[in-house]
A protein has these predicted regions:
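N-terminal hydrophobic/helix-forming segments and targeting peptides
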Residues: 1-368
Length: 368
C-alpha cells in the first residue's frame, strides 16, 4: 500500500494548483476526477456539478457513510469593465482589508492561465462588496472571471501546510486519501461515498441542492470534512477535531458515534493518536445543509490559521493547518468507514449501559 503521508500530501498539493471560487471550480473538479480515476474509484456528477464517488461495502444492511467537502474558496468575480480597470464582486466571506488598495490578486482565465493584478480600492457602496482591479498588463477580459488572492498554491513549511485555500482543499484531499486507502485495503461494511461539492462559500449551495435531491440514501451518515478556525479546545497540532456542531446546528450523536468509535480503535492500536472534540461555532459547514433535509450528520475539522486568508493586523496571507492534524484526519475517516456497524459500542455508551450490581442493589435497598 502506498505510504499514507506521501499520498495525502501529493493529493493536496495537486489540488492546490487549481485556484477556484464559487461556481468556477473546474480546475479542482478536473483534478478530483483525475485522482479518482487513478485510484480506480467509481464516481459520477449530479446535475449541479457535485462529484460523488462510491466505494461499495460488504453488508447491504449497514448504514452508508458519506464524507463531504467543498471545492471552492472565497475570492472575487469580475463582473464588468471600468476606465480604471475591472469591477469585481466579492464571492463569499473575505477579510475587510480585501477591499483596500494594493491587495495582490490573480485573475483566472478560461485556459487556466493567471493574470496578475491588484485591487485599487472599493467600488460603489460598501454594501455592494465590490472593488476595482488593475492588471499589471492591461487587457480586455470577458466576465465572469474568478479572482483569487496572489498567495502560494501549496507549501510544506516545517509542520505547517500553507495554501491559499486550505479551506476546503484539505477536506477534499483527506477524502481522496481515504478512498484510496479503502480501495486498496479491507472493504468497509457499508457503502462509502466521497462527496465534493460546489459553491459552499456562498451559502452551502451545492450541498443543499444535493441533499434536497436525495442523491444519497436517506439512512446515510454524513460527515463534513472542513477546515475551521482555531478555538480554545481546537488547537493546531493536537489532532483533527470531532465537530459536535457549527454556528447553526448541533449534530447527531448517532453519526458522531462512528467517529468516536474510530478514535477509540485508533487509540487501542496507537495510544499516541491525537484527536479533539469541540463545538466549532466559528462558521457553518455542510453537515448543517444535510441535517436540514433529515440526514444524520457529524463532522471533522482541521484547526485553521488565517481563516479565509485573514491574518493579524489586516494582512492577507495563506491559510495553514498542522500536518499531523491533516494526516490524523485521514486516519480517522478511514477507520470510521470500518466502524459504522460497531458505532453503538463506544466505551462511553457501554459504561452507561452497564450499571454495577452493587449500585443496582443499593438503589433497590434505599428506594424508600
Amino acid at each position: 500500500m502506498t505510504d499514507l503521508k506521501q499520498r495525502a500530501l501529493d493529493y493536496l498539493s495537486r489540488l492546490g494548483g487549481n485556484p477556484a471560487t464559487a461556481f468556477r471550480e473546474e480546475g479542482v473538479a478536473s483534478t478530483v476526477k483525475a485522482i479518482l480515476r487513478e485510484i480506480g474509484a467509481r464516481f459520477e456528477q449530479d446535475a449541479f456539478g457535485n462529484i460523488i464517488a462510491k466505494v461499495p461495502g460488504t453488508d447491504p444492511s449497514a448504514n452508508p457513510l458519506a464524507v463531504v467537502a467543498h471545492m471552492d474558496h472565497p475570492g472575487f468575480e469580475i463582473t464588468g469593465s471600468h476606465p480604471d480597470g475591472h469591477i469585481a464582486t466579492a464571492m463569499g466571506g473575505i477579510p475587510p482589508s480585501s477591499f483596500e488598495s494594493g491587495v495582490p490578486v490573480q485573475v483566472l482565465l478560461p485556459d487556466g492561465s493567471r493574470v496578475n493584478g491588484a485591487t485599487t480600492g472599493r467600488y460603489g457602496e460598501e454594501s455592494d462588496r465590490q472593488v476595482l482591479i488593475k492588471l499589471e498588463q492591461p487587457q480586455d477580459l470577458e466576465p465572469p472571471l474568478s479572482v483569487v488572492f496572489d498567495l502560494i498554491d501549496y507549501e510544506l513549511d516545517g509542520d505547517m501546510i500553507r495554501m491559499r485555500a486550505v479551506d476546503d482543499l484539505a477536506g477534499c484531499g483527506s477524502i481522496l486519501a481515504m478512498i484510496a486507502q479503502l480501495t486498496e485495503g479491507d472493504a468497509s461494511p457499508g457503502d462509502v461515498y466521497g462527496v465534493f461539492t460546489r459553491a459552499e462559500e456562498v451559502g452551502l449551495v451545492g450541498a443543499r441542492l444535493m441533499a434536497d435531491s436525495g442523491t444519497l440514501p436517506p439512512d446515510t451518515l454524513v460527515i463534513s470534512a472542513e477546515s475551521s478556525r482555531t478555538l480554545p479546545g481546537a488547537e493546531q497540532g493536537e489532532g483533527p477535531v470531532i465537530r459536535v456542531g457549527d454556528a447553526g446546528f448541533t449534530f447527531t450523536a448517532d453519526a458522531e458515534s462512528v467517529l468516536i468509535r474510530a478514535r477509540e480503535t485508533l487509540n487501542e492500536r496507537d495510544n499516541g493518536f491525537k484527536c479533539q472534540r469541540q463545538l466549532m461555532s466559528g462558521g457553518t459547514c455542510e453537515a448543517s445543509a444535510f441535517a436540514v433535509f433529515g440526514y444524520q450528520t457529524t463532522g471533522i475539522a482541521f484547526p485553521l490559521g488565517n481563516y479565509h486568508n485573514g491574518a493579524p493586523e489586516g494582512r492577507i496571507e495563506a491559510e495553514y493547518i498542522h500536518i499531523d492534524d491533516y494526516l490524523g484526519g485521514v486516519k480517522l475517516l478511514t477507520e470510521a468507514a470500518h466502524c459504522v456497524s460497531d458505532r453503538t459500542n463506544t466505551a462511553f455508551r457501554q459504561r452507561l449501559r452497564e450499571v454495577p450490581a452493587d449500585m443496582r442493589q443499593r438503589m433497590l435497598d434505599t428506594r424508600g
